[in-house]
Amino acid sequence: MFWTLYAATHAAALLQPPAHVAIVGGGWSGWGAAKALIENGAKVTLLDAVPDPTGKTPFLTPTGKPFEAGTRGFWMDYPNIVSLVTSDLGLDENAVFTDYTNSSFYSPDGLEATAPVFSKGAKIFGQTIPELPSPLGQVVATVDLFERVPIADRVTMLGLLYGMLDFVRDETTFEAYDRMSAHQLFIKMGISKRMVDDFIKPTLLVGLFKPPEELSAAVAMELLYFYALAHQTAFDVRWIKSKSITELILAPLADKLASYKLPIPPAQGTAGEVVAVPEAEAALTVLGGSFVSGLQLDPGTGQVSGLTYTDRATGEKRSLEGLSGCVLALGAKGMKSVVQGSPALARRAPELCAAASLDAIDVISVRLWLDRTVPTRTPANVFSRFEELRGAGGTFFMLDQLQDDNPTLLWGNAEPQGSVVACDFYNAGALLALPDEELTRILMEDLLPVAVSAFGEAKLVDSYVQRFPGAVTWFSPGSYRKRPPLQTSVSNLVCAGDWVRMGEREHGAKGLCQERAYVSGLEASNALARNGHLGVGMGRQHIVIPIRDDEPQVVAGRAVNKALADAFTANPLVKALGLKASPWVR
């Protein structure tokens, strides 16, 4: 019976035309979805506004030098991306990523703090110490790494420990934390103003791209928990070792997926008849420079059946029809555009209208080519408390240190002259209107030489500036319920991206995180497969590797807190008085 059913299902799968799924948006989430869909036998059309979403065509400045928008790190707990690089693409991990590196925080007063590399053995007073349980290990390892913040202020960070154990006690509690700003929570938990201003605020500005007063307390706690509490080594970070992330990882992935062919159904003919075998069709079509303006729903089924887009090269409006499913791998800005152009979808999926109402964050990326090499303590660095930032978060990365195997690549294959510095401004709305020359002047005169004096001796050889208005998700207070779900109200429409709520498929990677974006793409494909939209026999689920288990003392702390809170709220007197287990949130 089993084999009969299997044979019938297999035959049906071969005879049916492959499902055709459109992916709107590239990046980690779009390519994650493409990978899982194509490996499941689907036909995929990926549309993105950038000219070449595959990464095969590197972006060059007008003077022929390489440029990448934003410098993004790869933290210790990125198991799915590491598996993609090593197992799926067969790349040498050490050729793709740098070693884990230290990071430095600089203010107008100079060096403020240095982040250790825990996996290399943290040091205290010059002596290497063994890995200690979290959070004890982090506290001990950073004793002598803060240059100016007094110990009395650092100790107040302990007030956050309870919040990190408490905020995920249940969905209701999480939403209560989400409605509160991180700034309010820090006050209620007794974190000193100096600790917030000198360390936590700059960290959030470059981690979630907004200051504490504009961030959801729940998402801030997620970030701090994921990177700082769950494991001592979770904060260890490394970087792309050459060229760009798109060239080293996404381009090989696109090449591999482009080699897939759709299955050819068995030839149908009468006995003795010679039947021509059709040529296998490529499983992947990539439409770069394509702006999707709307989705069409089938009036009968209420499912996505097509979309319209504009070809940037020609200005021509085109359509894609006969879709079996669709993945929206978009941020808030892209979601707003698609929903506004899709009246039927807006009526059917109010959750996407809510997502489209959320705001996003402005980003500016600057790359500087200098006439001499500038030595720094660490290759990755953060600006803190500089008035010239106008409320933005700022980072600078010494690419000549991170990508030192072939420095000529950083200079467009010309003879290297000195350091190449990648600088990013987040929450950069107050800087957007400044001309390029003023942004480079601020960096060369007001920021870099104050952080590292040797920059004062360097002269600018070349520079390039790009602005990205509304480019990044803003996790504002109360935004959780408005973030798009993995599965929408339209059964064959799913969402992917670091801001997506994955529900029962929730992953341990949190915040503005490449791992989370990639995993969400895999899970978006899995959702279409589970719901039968890829066809009979195409329900295969792409494996998603979970984050390693939290350290046992952290798990125990959460369990004890939940047990006590549940017992407290179950008390009849507590119920009668309307008391809360976490009275600082509501």
PLM features: what roles do these ranges have?
Residues M1-L14:
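N-terminal chloroplast transit peptides
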Residues A19-L46:
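N-terminal Rossmann-like FAD-binding beta1-loop-alpha1 element of flavoenzymes
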Residues I38-T61:
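Glycine-rich FAD pyrophosphate-binding loop
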Residues N40, I240-K241, A251, G269, ...:
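Mid-domain catalytic core of redox enzymes
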Residues K56, G64-F97:
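Conserved FAD-binding subdomain of flavin-dependent enzymes
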Residues T86, E93-A218, F235, R530, ...:
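Mobile amphipathic helical/loop "lid" adjacent to a hydrophobic cofactor/ligand pocket
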Residues P116-G121, T310, W369-L370, P375-R586:
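Conserved flavin/dinucleotide-binding core of flavoenzymes
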Residues A152-L295, G302:
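Active-site/ligand-binding neighborhood in enzyme catalytic cores
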